[in-house]
Regions:
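Non-catalytic peripheral regions of nucleotide-handling enzymes
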Residues: 1-78
Length: 78
């Protein structure tokens, strides 16, 4: 299940920092960006913008914005 995450954005809407338990971490590099739209035929469609990010502490993380709500989440795999 995705976990809510606080994100700082640049003017183009791309994440530049994420809030972690220890405070804000800067994004060093945008590794990948893609969008997905699904379930458009239902009452609860899905529209998300995904960003794979390299953080200043060396971790790679994937976050997405629910484009219908505007909320941001960390995507966990596995």
């Amino acid at each position: 299940m995705p976990r809510s995450v606080a994100v700082r954005l640049e003017s183009t809407g791309v994440p530049v920092a994420l809030r972690r338990n220890s405070g804000w971490l800067d994004v060093v590099e945008l590794l990948d960006r893609y969008r997905t739209e699904d379930r458009w035929w239902t009452e609860r469609p899905v529209s998300r913008a995904y960003y794979e990010l390299l953080l200043e502490d060396g971790r790679t993380i994937t976050v997405f914005q629910d484009e219908l709500e505007g909320s941001w989440y960390e995507q966990k795999y596995g």
